[in-house]
């Protein structure tokens, strides 16, 4: 378990929203919708199974769940399999979620990113892919970098991951340096635990006005750690359902597949 001090250090790394916007006239989304919204959930948490997925299912929406291998427990496997069968995406969040040492108690050494090298990280991503395939039957998966960073032993592993063919797309953190959206380093804007439904809806509206893409990231929903309240999550989901005629809500890989096939949607943040 992370300590309170650790939670404060990672703060904004737990409830994230990714906002990518360019000029509205340059964007085209399915059905003439004005923006695309992706809902993602990290760490294979019980509250995602118990609260988030039922809320999404009730609204007819599909999300992406980035699972950590060592967080999976046998009694939950069938529930994750059922979620995938219902159209939710299962994504790769590595086996051990190696983050920088600064995010963990001093005694935790073995599964920090400093203790890894690039081959070790790619081997772990490959292993997690196999675990996911055993659950959902799919041969390709997207990836979310642990703690929003992509370092192993101080070396950026994205260049090697990019050419490895192991994952289709990567959700990271921070703004990219270029003007074109990089599907292997999708940028992120993070919000803290106090984010409300109104905060999230305002971000959606900003994306809609600019014709952009908003990727929303959660950890706990109404429980677990670094959580957003179930009420705030429900408000966002209700808003997305009510505006389905103007907002396209789909899993991460589905939206990124669309972006990849529509060059006019590949502009980076404005």
Model-predicted segments: where are they?
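N-terminal secretory signal peptides that target proteins for export/translocation
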Residues: 1-6
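Bacterial N-terminal signal peptides
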Residues: 9-19
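Membrane-interface motif at the C-terminal end of an N-terminal transmembrane signal
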Residues: 20-25
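Active-site beta->alpha N-cap acidic-glycine motif
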Residues: 26-101, 124-150, 205, 246, ...
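C-terminal domain-boundary segment and adjacent tail
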Residues: 27-31, 60-63, 71-75, 133, ...
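Catalytic domains of cell-wall/extracellular-matrix polysaccharide-remodeling enzymes
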Residues: 51, 73-75, 102-201, 232
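Short, histidine-centered active-site or binding-site loop motifs used for metal coordination
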Residues: 94-96, 109, 218-222
